[in-house]
């Protein structure tokens, strides 16, 4: 039997790696469009600024073909290079298009009519056609300009610093819309605005050169449709991943925004590795996971064999991205997502709800994370020289913090006084919020996660949601027959000063603590945890 399992493991790995054998046939060369790219050999900032604005208008134009927009994008992304012609050789590596570099010496006056080099084969009719394309700006752009400020195109950029400020600001906005151009092109604008605000705060985008949202959308669609541009951007990203800390300003910005592009479209795979395998919790020993664990092992080897370009599979539109889809390992994915929702607040923004999400294994991950949050990794503990007492103390500390935030991994409630081990009852009969201690007499926090008590929690929460509360006798009396107390939080009345409101809150907290201590003294079975008994109400009412 063991030989069969070993053969199955080798078969699974080989199945993922067989596409990379040396005898794989080379695909046939397809028909490639001719893309004309305008370049300048001069470092004149005014000329380069005019070429940038010209390329930007070609991308925006209503009458421009896809090849026109692709050439304008390549020219625009090459403007920071001192030798544009040499830099464009990166684009010639792409099997998608043929590049025709056209050198220009300037523009006629303040117009967008290019002046080709004497060696160029560009005709006068083509020059006039490009000028007409640049002037055909869509009506959806305000003031017939891509920029929010209408006077940007009329500005003078005679100094190198002014041109670089304009160039870097425009290119950074193009890089920002590239981040999700393949995986989520219709994402809400708020995600783009957050990154825009980040780079404005860092001084990498000048607010004067902000593009209109419609202009950014057009640029994103143009990049999405032009594979040769995405190939070129991938080479740029690889050059930006320099091992040295000394880099020019442009590639430092490219390397920073490239972190949003890396592993795009592979969030499910890496989250499964991080939360499912990285935690190394005993639940992985389930027999149902054995086959998918072999699959994940094969996929990790498969990813390593793809080389440094594997990080940009979504940007490159690679079919190999489908190999890493979570549908290939649904149980491990569901289990990992359950863990992630408990231990990582960032998972709230991740849309993990898929048709292949298994609810049972998702809940298994949730319960495992709640129970194992105080677990200690034995190998790390051994490296740190932790004793058994240290492990117990660490687990107890984490358990106390978890209970103080609502119990069993729940998020803290809005009411700052609602953290007493989740003993929060939504509303009393009179509409005031209150705490019910009588329902928790039999609570034993040493066995906090027992199935019996979990059922008690569910019953308690269900009754609280339905507004029925518990037994009237318990609702009217505290623990040990103590008289009831109004636990409604004081509200700040209009015109009340800060000192008066603070005094009311202090008095309220003192009454709550006093009532809670009296309730503990009258408890018949001592059903509260040792930490609360030792510290009074301070452990549960942490103000």
UniProtKB/Swiss-Prot annotation:
InterPro entries: Paramyx_ncap (IPR002021). The keyword RNA-binding applies. RNA binds at residues 180, 195, 260, 350, 354. This is Nucleoprotein. GO terms for cellular component: helical viral capsid; host cell cytoplasm; ribonucleoprotein complex; viral nucleocapsid. Residues 448-461 have a biased composition (Acidic residues). Homomultimer; forms the nucleocapsid. Binds to the viral genomic RNA. N0 interacts with the phosphoprotein (via N-terminus); this interaction allows P to chaperon N0 to avoid N polymerization before encapsidation. Interacts as N-RNA template with the phosphoprotein (via C-terminus); this interaction positions the polymerase on the template. Disulfide bonds: none annotated. The gene is N. One of its GO terms (molecular function) is structural molecule activity. Its main location: virion. Keywords: Capsid protein, Helical capsid protein, Host cytoplasm, Ribonucleoprotein, RNA-binding, Viral nucleoprotein, Virion.
């Amino acid at each position: 039997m063991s030989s069969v399992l070993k053969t199955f493991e080798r078969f699974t790995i080989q199945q993922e790696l067989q596409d990379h054998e040396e005898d794989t046939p080379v695909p046939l060369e397809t028909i490639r469009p001719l893309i004309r790219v305008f370049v300048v050999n001069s470092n004149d900032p005014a000329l380069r600024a005019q070429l940038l604005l010209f390329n930007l208008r070609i991308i925006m134009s209503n009458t421009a073909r896809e090849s026109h927009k692709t050439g304008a994008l390549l020219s625009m992304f090459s403007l920071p290079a001192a030798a544009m012609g040499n830099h464009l050789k990166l684009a010639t590596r792409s099997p998608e298009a043929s590049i025709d570099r056209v050198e220009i010496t300037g523009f006629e006056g303040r117009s967008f009519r290019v002046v080709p080099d004497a060696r160029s084969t560009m005709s006068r009719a083509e020059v006039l056609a490009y000028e007409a394309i640049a002037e055909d700006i869509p009506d959806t752009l305000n003031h017939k300009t891509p920029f929010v400020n209408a006077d940007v195109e009329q500005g003078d950029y005679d100094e190198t610093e002014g041109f670089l400020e304009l160039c870097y600001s425009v290119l950074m906005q193009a890089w920002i819309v590239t981040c999700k151009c393949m995986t989520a092109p219709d994402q809400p604008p708020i995600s783009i605005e957050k990154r825009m605000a980040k780079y404005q705060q860092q001084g990498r985008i000048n607010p004067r050169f902000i593009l209109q949202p419609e202009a950014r959308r057009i640029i994103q669609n143009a990049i999405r449709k032009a594979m040769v541009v995405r190939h070129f951007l991938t080479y740029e990203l690889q050059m930006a991943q320099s091992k040295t800390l000394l880099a020019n300003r442009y590639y430092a910005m490219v390397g920073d925004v490239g972190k949003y592009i890396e592993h795009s479209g592979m969030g499910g795979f890496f989250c499964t590795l991080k939360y499912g395998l990285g935690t190394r919790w005993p639940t992985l020993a389930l027999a149902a996971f054995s086959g998918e664990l072999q699959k994940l092992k094969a996929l990790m080897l498969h990813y390593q064999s793809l080389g440094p370009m594997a990080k940009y599979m979504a940007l490159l539109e690679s079919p190999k991205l489908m190999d890493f889809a979570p549908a290939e390992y649904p149980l491990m994915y569901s289990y990992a997502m359950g863990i992630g929702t408990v231990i990582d607040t960032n998972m709230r923004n991740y849309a993990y709800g898929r048709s292949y999400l298994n609810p049972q294994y998702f809940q298994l991950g949730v319960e495992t994370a709640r129970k194992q949050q105080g677990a200690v990794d034995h190998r790390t503990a051994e490296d740190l020289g932790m004793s058994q007492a240290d492990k117990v103390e660490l687990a107890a500390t984490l358990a106390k913090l978890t209970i103080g935030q609502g119990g069993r991994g729940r998020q803290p409630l809005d009411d700052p006084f609602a953290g007493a081990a989740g003993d929060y009852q939504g509303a009393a009969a009179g509409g005031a919020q209150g705490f019910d201690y009588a329902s928790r007499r039999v609570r034993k926090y040493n066995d906090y996660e027992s199935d019996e008590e979990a059922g008690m929690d569910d019953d308690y929460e269900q009754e609280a949601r339905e507004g029925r509360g518990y037994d009237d006798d318990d609702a009217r009396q505290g623990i040990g027959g103590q008289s009831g107390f109004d636990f409604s939080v004081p509200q700040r009345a209009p015109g009340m000063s800060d000192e008066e409101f603070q005094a009311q809150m202090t008095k309220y907290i003192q009454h709550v603590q006093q009532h809670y201590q009296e309730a503990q003294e009258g408890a018949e079975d001592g059903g509260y945890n040792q930490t609360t008994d030792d510290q009074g109400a301070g452990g549960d009412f942490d103000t």
